[in-house]
């Protein structure tokens, strides 16, 4: 927070904090940091994630259910994307919505489309996924949605950099996380077929696949 107060000035968001919303204390921590940013008149940089250390963090610190984590993540995302509308003195926010969850990213996109339709100012929000994971989600975020006002969605892919020794713990976590990716396989497969159909402009591709 000291670095944010020093460098996140004049509307610039340079320094970000990561908030792991599977931790029970993260909602209160985020609210506290918002107050600090408002009082200190600096921008708050937020990278919002569900969490990556569930096998090593003490269990009592983590939400009891996945639904509780989902709720905490989504509520925090909505709060950060709307707090400037009702509170003119609210601090500027730079939000990185770092998620592989389709429901959460669609929720944010729909919220921002509604804000555009109503002529409301938008918070600074970008999306991020890990390189090699949830690529179909990254692609969908850059595509236009029919009958909706459009914004320029900025999507980032996070790439690990360093020697094998330096990155070993990171790589082990990603290997563990990839086990959960199997649960998304059917969704990913459908998304990739739809992307292929769109690029080749073959409306009957999926129909032929099912025959």
Put a short name on every predicted segment.
Residues 1-211:
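Positively charged, amphipathic and often flexible ligand-engagement surfaces
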